[in-house]
């Protein structure tokens, strides 16, 4: 896509996806607070929330190790023996840290009957090459199988091919230039593959959205609207359905407006009859790792739905589960 990849600075891994740097932070005090909260009769849930909902991925890593070294115990096992339900799910998601939780979710999504397609979308789509490689490596270390192998076994036909494009981790890096001629070419290809012909060339659309950088996708969406006075999002909704439609929309929104993408995913987990707690818990925890992004998501949510995200979450959840999610949204 323009200049050869060799000259382009790769996007660095997200916090928690690269080699763990030594941080000047001592987890001993928090480890002791956690042990005290769970030792003996009863559990001090407020302390669990206060300590765990406020840590970044590197601190969580240190804290998990400190707990293990100091008490010779496994923090996840202790938490599981003390609490239950979605509160437990949320705490464990935090303790694992973002990368191990991604791998845990992928394994869980593909090992039971039926595939949780939403989980595959949430974990794998719109990721940087560096994060995708980290996920694939850790998945292999954990399960002794390749992620490609398991995805192949769980998806069918064109959706499988779409996800194999995603897993190839050969997106343009974010520092790659956005070249107008290439954008125009992609726009025409997308038009010809969808509205411009009878029948849709699904894989061409998948290919473009799986290989371009966020900045390039943003430019493609902008140019498409200028040229054809229609949103690419509308076109995808009209031309696709099911899992592939959802996947392509998620890739498109990653480029056009990441905060709005996540605001819509959160609303999707709460809208309609019954809250999809599995999705809600993991989406809130995933978003909470990056505080700046979290604030943008809260702003986007308010802008779109005219109410605060935490207010909405409070209406859908209760008890310690509610308090944990609200704390993850930065309101402790």
Question: Residue ranges of each PLM-predicted region?
Answer:
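Structural signature for extended repeat/solenoid scaffolds and their inter-repeat hinge/linker regions
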Residues: 1-332
């Amino acid at each position: 896509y323009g200049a050869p990849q060799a000259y382009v600075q790769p996007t660095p891994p997200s916090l928690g996806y690269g080699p763990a740097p030594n941080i000047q932070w001592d987890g001993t005090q928090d480890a002791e607070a956690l042990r005290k909260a769970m030792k003996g009769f009863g559990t001090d849930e407020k302390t669990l929330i206060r300590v765990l909902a406020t840590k970044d991925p590197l601190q969580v890593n240190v804290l998990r190790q400190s707990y293990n070294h100091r008490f010779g115990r496994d923090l996840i096992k202790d938490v599981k023996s003390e609490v239950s339900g979605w509160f437990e799910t949320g705490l464990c998601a935090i303790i694992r840290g973002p990368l191990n939780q991604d791998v845990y979710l992928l394994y869980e999504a593909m090992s039971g009957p039926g595939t949780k397609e939403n989980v595959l979308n949430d974990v794998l789509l719109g990721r940087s090459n560096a994060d995708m490689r980290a996920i694939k490596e850790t998945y292999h270390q954990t399960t002794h199988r390749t992620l490609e192998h398991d995805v192949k076994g769980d998806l069918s036909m064109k959706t499988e091919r779409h996800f194999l494009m995603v897993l190839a981790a050969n997106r343009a890096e974010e520092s790659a230039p956005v070249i107008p001629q290439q954008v125009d070419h992609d726009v025409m290809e997308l038009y010809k593959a969808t509205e411009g012909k009878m029948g849709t060339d699904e894989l061409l659309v998948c290919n473009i959205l799986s290989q371009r950088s966020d900045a390039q996708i943003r430019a493609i969406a902008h140019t498409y609207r200028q040229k054809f006075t229609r949103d690419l999002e509308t076109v995808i909704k009209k031309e696709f359905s099911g899992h592939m439609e959802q996947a392509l929309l998620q890739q498109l929104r990653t480029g056009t407006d990441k905060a709005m993408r996540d605001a819509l995913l959160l609303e999707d987990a709460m809208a309609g009859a019954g809250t999809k707690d599995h999705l809600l818990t993991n989406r809130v925890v995933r978003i909470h790792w990056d505080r700046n992004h979290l604030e943008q998501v809260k702003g986007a949510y308010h802008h779109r739905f005219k109410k605060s995200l935490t207010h909405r979450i409070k209406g859908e959840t209760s008890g310690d589960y509610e308090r944990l999610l609200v704390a993850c949204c930065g309101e402790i």
